[in-house]
Amino acid sequence: MNAPPAFESFLLFEGEKITINKDTKVPKACLFTINKEDHTLGNIIKSQLLKDPQVLFAGYKVPHPLEHKIIIRVQTTPDYSPQEAFTNAITDLISELSLLEERFRTCLLPLRLLP
């Protein structure tokens, strides 16, 4: 069969998680390639990027079902860099998910489901 070995879907070496390439076709745009991720992370990052008013375009794609990576394209206004927008989106997501976890734990405490 032509499928890659199963371990390739999760084994990642040092420095291989993300690569950033400038998009030469569009001004103020970058392509972020994130290895060993899928639609779950791509969709949530894209949604967070689109909340930023200085982001003109944000989209993602999975090149092929057997390739375990996503490519996120970000275009911003002239006074804002795509890398800055991406970093801000990730930071905001981390804080939102931390708040969600905190609220979830608070709700479960009366039920004594958590230690």
UniProtKB/Swiss-Prot annotation:
The primary location reported for this protein is nucleus
InterPro entries, per the entry = RBP11, RBP11-like, RBP11-like_dimer, RNA_pol_Rpb11_13-16kDa_CS, Rpo11-like
Q: Name one GO biological process term.
A: transcription by RNA polymerase II
Instruction: Report which superkingdom the organism of origin falls in.
Output: Eukaryota
| UniProt-annotated location(s) | Nucleus
| One GO molecular-function entry | protein dimerization activity
Tissue and organ distribution? Ubiquitously expressed.
Q: Which Gene3D superfamilies has this protein been placed in?
A: RNA polymerase, RBP11-like subunit
GO CC terms for this protein?
RNA polymerase II, core complex
The alphabetized UniProt keywords are: DNA-directed RNA polymerase, Nucleus, Transcription
Q: What is this protein called?
A: DNA-directed RNA polymerase II subunit RPB11-b1
- Please spell out the taxonomic lineage of the organism that makes this protein: Eukaryota, Metazoa, Chordata, Craniata, Vertebrata
